[in-house]
Amino acid sequence: KGQASRNFHDWSRKYQVKDGNQTRMTLLNNWEATYFDFDEAKLVKLMDDAVELGVDMFLLDDGWFANKYPRSGDHQGLGDWDETADKLPHGVGYLTEAAKKKGIKFGIWIEPEMVNPKSELYEKHKDWVIHLPNRDEYYFRNQLVLDLSNPKVQDYVFGVVDNLMTKYPDIAFFKWDCNSPITNIYSVYLKDKQSHLYICLLYTSPSPR
């Protein structure tokens, strides 16, 4: 009983998951504790709690980015990947260093393939989203899906990850989220009968396996 699922798990650990047979790290995620309402002091206190619990990693979830439209909720800021100055005046580096001093690893939340209409990115590049020109846009979690068939969008998504890893090499983990299905299915970049290429290009983005 249950042998099929156990066989699948064994196959996944052996062939699909990186270091699948190693012990998994435990983590404390700030999301349920703070949602979007946090600052440096709250996060460092949660790190102390993580250390006390014997947890291996602290994960900073959604809400740490954007300044023109600060990420105070899920209705704005997605796409603008600079630290919110009011929440994190010393930047992500301050938090990675705090975690390092406490002997735990640091992870961070991203969702670079999505965008809020209320964001600087959308204001500059409305043509970067998947949408049907002759229909109203449909929003899921107040966001739209970026068109990864467009090389400029591919470069942008890669740049989000590359910039964080370059600036903050002590980031040990990305929680790469995907909070919207693909709606508004149409690419203004691709020619007719080529929209399946979105999926092909999604698979070439730098998402961890």
List the predicted regions and their residue ranges.
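Acidic carboxylate-rich catalytic motifs and surrounding loops in phosphoryl-/glycosyl-chemistry enzymes
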Residues: 110-111, 209
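Non-membrane alpha-helical structural segments and their capping/turn regions in soluble enzymes
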Residues: 40, 44, 85-89, 93, ...
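Conserved small/polar residues in nucleotide/adenosyl-binding loops
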Residues: 203-208
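Active-site groove signature of glycoside hydrolases
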Residues: 56-62, 159-189
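Glycine-rich tight-turn/loop motif centered on a GG-T
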Residues: 74-86, 188-201
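Active-site-adjacent "subsite" loops/lids of carbohydrate-active enzymes
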Residues: 112-163
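Flexible glycine/acidic-rich beta-alpha junction loops that bind and position SAM and/or redox cofactors
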Residues: 68-69, 115-125, 181-191
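Conserved structural scaffold segments of CAZyme catalytic domains across common CAZy folds
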Residues: 1-107, 113-115, 120, 140
